[in-house]
Amino acid sequence: TLSLALESPYYIKNAVSDRVLKARELVLSQTHQGSALPASADAAAASLEYGHGRLGVDQVTAGGFDNLALLSNGLLSFDGDVSLNMGQSLRLYSGALNLSDSAAANSRVDLSAPYLLLAGILAPLEAKDQYVRPVSTGTPSQQATQAQFNASGNLIDVRGNVVFGSKGTLRQADNSLLSVERRGFDHVQLTSQGDLRFLAGAGADVIAKGISTQLLTQGDMTLRAAQLYPGTEVGARVIAGYLNDISGTSINFDPTRTLAIGRTGQGEAPVPYSAFGCLQLGAANIQQGGVVRAPLGLIEIGNLGASKVELLPGSLTSVSGKGLVLPYGGTVDGQVYKYNGKTVTFLGQGALVNENSDLSVGVILGGKSVQVQPDATVDLSGGGELLGAGFISGRGGSTDARYSPLVQIGANGSFILPGLGSNPIYAIVPGVQPGYAPVAPEGGAVDPLIGQQITIGAGVPGLAAGTYTLMPSTYALMPGAFRVEINGLAGLGTEGATQPLRNGSWSTAGRLSIAHTGISNSVASQLILTSADTLRRYSQYNETGYAQFALADAAKLGVPRPMLPVDAKTLKLALEPGAGADAFSFKGIGRFDAAAGGYGGTVAVLNMGSGNIEVVAAGKSATQGFNGVTLDADSLNAMGAARLMLGGLTLVKYGQGGNYITVAEGVNTPKGSITLREGATLAAPEVFLVSNTGEIVLEQGASINTLGRGKASYDARDGFTYQVANMLAVSNGLLNVISKAQAGGQTSGGIRLGVCASAPCSGQTALYSDGSLVALTDNAFELGDQVRYGTRHLNLGLNNINVGSPEALAAAAAGNRLPSGMTLTQQLLDRLLRGDTQVG
């Protein structure tokens, strides 16, 4: 292993010169350069340059190194064409990856290793005012470049602030600023034959809110892997075509640049050992043709200001936990559930933390145009299991055997307590082997080496002979798993027979190796293997899982349960106006089914600009003069969600008051008008139209039909009541609603059903459900003559109902004495009570 580091120390301001305040720059070239310095140190001192280092690939090759780690707390520059291939690992830590000043504009950088780590360094805040540190915290350079950066491996990890190209400033001794700029790359490509993982950076919010890791370039970027995903509870983003930040939630992109995601290998990779991560993909143009996952987490594509988002044929965009079985914290006393030492906070249905937050779990597709092409899959289905294990110290044992080596008896009969240095503890889990151990905030006794695996022969009951990836020891309680202790006290070369031990464990021989490298121990090590059932006899655990604890907690509080892995998630379409009828097209596969005991998934459509939304029949263009987002009804219906919501997002605060479903505010405030145009039909188990400020309109000839579409998501039978200001809902479920007064006395534009917005008009407006039909508004309600409806439960919630004959109501209106609300005549009352028996 060769490790080189070029650091940037702190200097006292009043005792520093500009000579030492140079940007730290480590230059990597294909061949090393001979030194031009004088032979003696004294003679060379005056010509030495601070903060500068250089390494040639030929030097690395000549040294026979399989592992290379380079750290520059500043710039890591490539001097022209560079091709570097390492036998085991390549780790690059830097403030920016860029070309050197002298490199050709069309330079090509090719890096490869079985394991590749790209890690960014974020400079910490300077220690008080009297210190200065020569670190440039810049953004990508916009200087012209035709350079190519290609990196490949069997596993690629990205951690921290990884920036290609740099433009920033350094503070000088006189407090002035010196500009520092290095060119980036026209195209960056990362190719992993296995996974491409995003690991946690220095802090949760160091790059943006909730984001600790990013890949950032001003040019095009292509990521190819068996699958991309963030680690457990990691917030990460990938940005291509970066120009500058507009706000904390929006970026100005180069309209000519593209972020492309591709797939390597055959077949679908198994769901990774990860939960509750967040991954944002941002560029003017995004082509998602690979496998992007964030199990039980959040994926955002185009939500930072994209022009066009395409989910390509064969792609998978998934936040489903189906197939995932993962150790995730636990509870000792049944009162508090903790992960990594912190109390776990549960989310209510809707997956928003509060009124002003955005979606925390689900998928967000944003931009002016979102196209889901044939055979592209968006998976928000329910599934997955988070296992709990809270160690109970007491009669079951005073130490947790997952973290402590077993006591041994020496040759003289004395007790020996090995340390983790000689006797590290891991776990192995039968089944499909991931090849590399997962990385998570809550680790095991010892972190396995990257790709570390063990080959075991036959003879241990319940464990087939084979090669297994060494996992963190917290996995030892998983179904079928084994605790693995490498008995370093026995030394190497142990080839003894597999035999049982008196404590229920087994002793056997195993050979350590590193995946995808050909590196392995030539001699075996003694292993102590302990099945999960036997491990439970060594130490006592409360194995209440995440979902089991959440259900018990809700029962204790007397409120509806929080969101669980079995629940399907929400797909938010965060669209911007400007694409006409091409704003959204869905021809792919939508998975919104819940696992057993779960709630179905939701599609929520929002116009992030004016808020105005219109839904037109298939093949129709945007309405002339309409200022908003135009959607094709067939595309909305084709997704197959249990709930279709236009205008807003639902919010449930778990805990006190957790019975009420409201609509989110902030960037998700329901605003503008929601219009269902003539000829358009919305069909789902339940359909909601909401607007706090605009009107809800169903034109004559438009319809909403939930008959035969299946079970709705959670409803009144699950303990929920909707509390909104202006909503039209057609549902196969049972809906309870109450009116919500808006802040500042604001009112909506009301609800109009069966109106003729532009003559000529034809057809009937139809509203049919197998459950509930709700019209709740704080303003006028209009029911046209051509409206037909059928439902089991009709609920009209209005601030005012004006009852009288047509003549009396007309006279009151003429005298400006008729308040906004519903005008109820005898004829209208008869219609409401009669309903429609033509359908269902």
Annotated model-derived regions:
Residues T1-G840:
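Extracellular and secretory-pathway beta-repeat/beta-biased strand scaffolds
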